[in-house]
């Protein structure tokens, strides 16, 4: 058995990209599947990753709001997507609003530049074996 850790993530939305970038940064080899551009949902229009439906989808930044608190926790944990969002933010009062196309392009570039991430466009093949879960070795 190889000592190289590998995982597969299905979907290059916000959560899939954040997870892939974080795991790859920890040395895990990631295969990231994204169905676009072969298949689009009714809400999506471009082939990029982390495509937001609304420019203010990232919501409020106040720490007394759930979305603001979540973003602060993500910052403290080393989020890759929040700096990307902040780089393409647009004025929206107390919300973190972004230029959606620029944000998607920036996240797509981050993911594609990460050497531990292999992007597969299209739907993943059906699994022929049961899912395996990895747990760290006991101390």
Task: Describe the role of every protein-language-model region.
Residues 21-83:
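N-terminal FAD cofactor-binding segment of flavoenzymes
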Residues 15, 19, 70, 103-107:
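General structural feature for long, well-ordered alpha-helical segments within catalytic domains
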Residues 5-31:
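N-terminal Rossmann-like FAD-binding beta1-loop-alpha1 element of flavoenzymes
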Residues 73-139:
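Feature captures the FAD/FMN-dependent oxidoreductase FAD-binding
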Residues 6-7, 57-58, 94-95:
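Short, contiguous strand/loop micro-motifs
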Residues 2, 25-27, 114, 129:
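Short, well-ordered coil/turn elements that cap or connect secondary structure elements
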């Amino acid at each position: 058995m190889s000592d190289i850790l590998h995982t597969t993530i299905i979907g290059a939305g916000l959560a899939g990209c954040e997870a892939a970038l974080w795991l790859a940064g920890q040395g895990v080899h990631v295969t990231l599947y994204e169905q676009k551009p072969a298949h689009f949902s009714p809400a999506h229009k471009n082939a990029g990753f982390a495509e937001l439906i609304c420019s203010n989808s990232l919501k409020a930044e106040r720490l007394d709001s759930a979305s603001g608190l979540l973003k602060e926790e993500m910052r403290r944990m080393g989020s890759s997507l929040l700096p990307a969002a902040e780089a393409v933010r647009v004025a929206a009062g107390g919300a973190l609003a972004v230029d959606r196309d620029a944000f998607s392009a920036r996240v797509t570039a981050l993911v594609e530049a990460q050497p531990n991430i292999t992007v597969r466009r299209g739907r993943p093949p059906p699994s022929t074996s049961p899912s395996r879960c990895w747990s760290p070795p006991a101390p």
